[in-house]
Amino acid sequence: TARRRVLEPAEIAGEARALTQQGHGRILLIASEDPTPHGWELALAAADGIASVAPIRPGEWSTETEGLFLAAELAPRPPADFARLAARGVSAYVLFQETYDPALYPTVHPGGPKASFENRLAGLENAAAGGIARLGLGALFGLGEPALETVALVAHARHLEMLTGRPAGSVSAPRLEPADDVPFTLAP
């Protein structure tokens, strides 16, 4: 089995450098749901490490501009924290609600940093309020009733568009089939 570990900022910069040398123009920074201030500071240091290897393109991704387009997939944070990310060049934020069913949500996340349905639902609005230009959202199909998840996902995307004046940068719908005989667990 794979062992998880935290990469140091220099390692992250090295990985970003390798990606840019291979011609990649977009990097998605993914970090675990570490709710501690230390975890957040690591995410900021990671963004700084990526920004140290190439100029960051603000705003929308384009093939006609030089530099990196930097996006983040992190736990929900307050708007002030997203402003700190935006100041580092992060211009897109992706967050999966996982399930839009408020009755099912506590079954999937009975405790820990993801336990608040409302906090997770507010994450994309907080990102927009903090200056993140592009928002991506999704639900994990197979957890709840597909029709409910679809309608709620579209409604959430529309709400964000009305709030920000911009359509969602991405809408994801992974796992379109139920995961039969796979119990919910708190750890892999």
Feature map (PLM): residue ranges:
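Short, hydrophobic beta-strand segments
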Residues: 1, 29, 180-184
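Auxiliary Fe-S-binding modules of radical SAM enzymes
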Residues: 14, 20, 151-155, 161-188
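Core AdoMet radical
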Residues: 2-14, 19-143, 165-172
